[in-house]
Amino acid sequence: MWNEFKKFAIRGNVIDLAVGVIIGGAFGKIVSSLVNDIIMPLVGLLLGGIDFSNLSWKVGKAVVKYGAFIQTVVDFLIIAFSIFLFVKLINKLYERVKKQEEMEETEPTLTKEEELLTEIRDLLKQQRETM
C-alpha cells in the first residue's frame, strides 16, 4: 500500500496539482490585499469616503457585514477573471502547438524518385557553378 501511495504521490499530475494549490493560495492572498488595501479604498473615496469594510446592518444583536461581502465579491471577480485570462492563454498556446504539429505532419514527403531527382538537380547546379 505504501508503494502504491509513493507511485501516486510522485506522479507528475499530483505534484502539478500541489504546486497549483500552493500558488493559488498565495495568489488569493495577493488579490485579497489588492482588493482590501487598494481597490476598495479608492472606490470608497470615489463614492464619497465610504469605508466598505465597516459597512453593516445591525438587526438586534446580529450584525450583517455587507461591506465585507462586497469586498469578497470583488476579490472573487478579480481571481475569476485572472483565471479566465490564464486559461485563455494556455488554450491559445495549445492551439498554436497543435497547428504546428499538424503542419509538420502534412508536409509533403518525397518519393524515392523525387528525392533522386532533387539530388540530381542539386548536383547539376553545383557542376554549373564550378565551371
Swiss-Prot record:
Q: How is this protein situated with respect to the membrane?
A: Multi-pass membrane protein
| Database matches in InterPro entries | Mechanosensitive_channel_CS, MS_channel, MSC/AndL, MscL_channel
Q: Name one Pfam family in it.
A: MscL
Q: Where are the transmembrane segments?
A: 8-28, 30-50, 67-87
Keywords (alphabetical) are:
Cell membrane, Ion channel, Ion transport, Membrane, Transmembrane, Transmembrane helix, Transport
An example Gene Ontology molecular-function term? mechanosensitive monoatomic ion channel activity
Cite the PROSITE patterns for this sequence: MSCL
Q: What are the subcellular locations of this protein?
A: Cell membrane
- GO-annotated cellular components: plasma membrane
Decide whether keyword 4Fe-4S is in the record. no
Q: What does this protein do?
A: Channel that opens in response to stretch forces in the membrane lipid bilayer. May participate in the regulation of osmotic pressure changes within the cell.
What is its quaternary makeup? Homopentamer.
Which NCBIfam families does this one have? Answer: mscL, PRK00567.1-4, PRK13953.1, PRK13955.1
Name the family: Belongs to the MscL family.
User: What is the name of this protein?
Assistant: Large-conductance mechanosensitive channel
What broad taxonomic lineage does this protein's source fall under? Answer: Bacteria, Bacillati, Bacillota, Bacilli, Bacillales
